[in-house]
């Protein structure tokens, strides 16, 4: 048994614990509470243990709910600044086609995420060489095979069989799923059948939604279902202003086993649809800014009660894979958009941990993660944040926590440890 104690422990599903501790054995959490109580309980039971103490913050490992690890080698694109999705895509495509070692790049991205305190990832894979990134890195999360550019005719001929084979070949653990890229990049038939493929296997769905301004609803709401359009683009070509969220909802894509990335171009009705379907939104504000999109409606999501998670996206559209940098940007946006409640830091930290786990169905069951509780896997992140009053410390972590991760444990195993953490605790990764 090992006890991990810290000046402040943040369980997420329980109140913050100053001078708190958790006890870990067999890769799982056995006790959570005040350090004196945890130590007393173990001694009273005659359980031998050693202790690792960090004079800072201990939190659950971060959960990155939207990424493309294979694009880690495309940081030159992410360092640019663009005037919208099409402008960014014009820069992305030639670099993508130049050829990369996708496996090596994805592995490098996984290491970077772990060093930043991340223990679970929603990773979208476009090229099969990158398919084992999460598995090889022993990260929790879901590997999603990306599905795009299928017409109805090609799908009927060979699409379903090909996609099923790709899905079934993904290495596990972690979990697996499919990512129908976006409403505008697939015809109707694949969008109808991909959810069935996933749900027959008990897998997960993840798609880009509300990332391109083209998806935004415009004009009066007009019934369109009887038109039986071949695709979202065909529907728009016929003059309908139906939004992409309503479109995929009618096709049965959304649900509690699905989460979306970005959610920038969302009306109040769109946001209500997501709530009604139990679909989480993974917000990626730094990626949106690089691409030149509008700001996501962070304050509206918070006020209306949408389930939220946080993602970095990839280095092809983001400055780093440090999730707390996106959390800080969400804090800035929420305040600028008029969210004044004092619970903002707590809500955003929850989104970056439990919210991401919930988005992928990892918050329940035997391998539950995203929070510190008895029976959960011991996915831990230690941060070099000075501890003062509890609320002020949490706000410091949220607003200025990027770059502060000093150690990351996955299943109770030290996977990253800074020199400062090793000097203080003796623990090496």
Language-model regions, residue ranges each:
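His/Asp/Glu-enriched, well-ordered alpha-helical/loop segment
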Residues: 227, 250-254, 296-387
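Histidine-centered catalytic micro-motifs
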Residues: 60-72, 204-213
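Histidine/acidic residue-rich metal-binding segments in metalloenzymes
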Residues: 49, 130-136, 159-280, 292-308
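C-terminal cap of metal-dependent C-N hydrolases
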Residues: 374-429
């Amino acid at each position: 048994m090992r006890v991990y104690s810290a000046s402040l422990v943040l369980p997420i599903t329980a109140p913050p614990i100053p001078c708190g501790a958790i006890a870990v054995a067999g890769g799982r959490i056995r006790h959570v509470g005040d350090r004196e109580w945890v130590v007393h309980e173990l001694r009273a039971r005659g359980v031998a243990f050693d202790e690792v103490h960090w004079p800072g913050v201990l939190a659950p490992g971060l959960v990155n709910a939207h990424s493309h690890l294979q694009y880690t080698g495309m940081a030159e694109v992410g360092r640019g600044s663009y005037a919208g999705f099409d402008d960014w895509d014009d820069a992305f495509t030639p670099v993508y086609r130049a050829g990369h070692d996708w496996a090596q790049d994805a592995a490098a991205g996984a290491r970077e995420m772990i060093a930043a305190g991340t223990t679970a990832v929603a990773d979208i894979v476009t090229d099969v060489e990158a398919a084992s990134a999460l598995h090889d890195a022993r990260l929790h999360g879901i590997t999603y095979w990306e599905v795009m550019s299928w017409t109805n005719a090609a799908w009927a001929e060979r699409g379903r069989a090909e996609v099923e084979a790709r899905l079934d070949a993904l290495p596990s653990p972690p979990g697996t799923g499919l990512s129908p890229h976006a409403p505008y990049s697939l015809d109707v038939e694949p969008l109808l059948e991909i959810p069935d493929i996933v749900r027959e296997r008990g897998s997960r769905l993840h798609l880009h939604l509300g990332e391109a301004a083209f998806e935004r609803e415009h004009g009066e709401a007009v019934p369109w279902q009887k038109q039986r359009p071949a695709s979202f683009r065909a529907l728009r070509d016929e003059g309908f202003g139906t939004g992409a969220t309503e479109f995929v909802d009618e096709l049965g894509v959304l649900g509690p086993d699905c989460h979306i990335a970005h959610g920038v171009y969302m009306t109040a009705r769109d946001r209500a649809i997501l709530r009604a379907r139990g679909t989480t939104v993974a917000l990626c504000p730094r990626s949106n800014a690089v691409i030149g999109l509008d700001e996501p409606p962070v304050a509206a999501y918070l006020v209306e009660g949408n389930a939220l998670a946080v993602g970095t996206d990839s280095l092809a559209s983001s400055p780093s894979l440090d999730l707390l940098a996106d959390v800080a940007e969400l804090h800035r946006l929420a305040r600028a958009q008029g969210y004044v409640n004092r619970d903002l830091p707590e809500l955003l930290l929850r989104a970056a941990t439990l919210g991401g786990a919930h988005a992928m169905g990892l918050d329940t069951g035997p391998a539950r993660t995203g929070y510190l509780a008895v029976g959960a896997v011991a996915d831990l992140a230690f941060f070099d944040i000075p501890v003062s009053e509890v609320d002020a410390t949490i706000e410091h972590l949220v607003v200025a926590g990027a770059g502060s991760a000093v150690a990351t444990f996955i299943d109770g195993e030290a996977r990253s440890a800074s020199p400062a953490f090793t000097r203080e605790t003796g623990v090496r990764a």
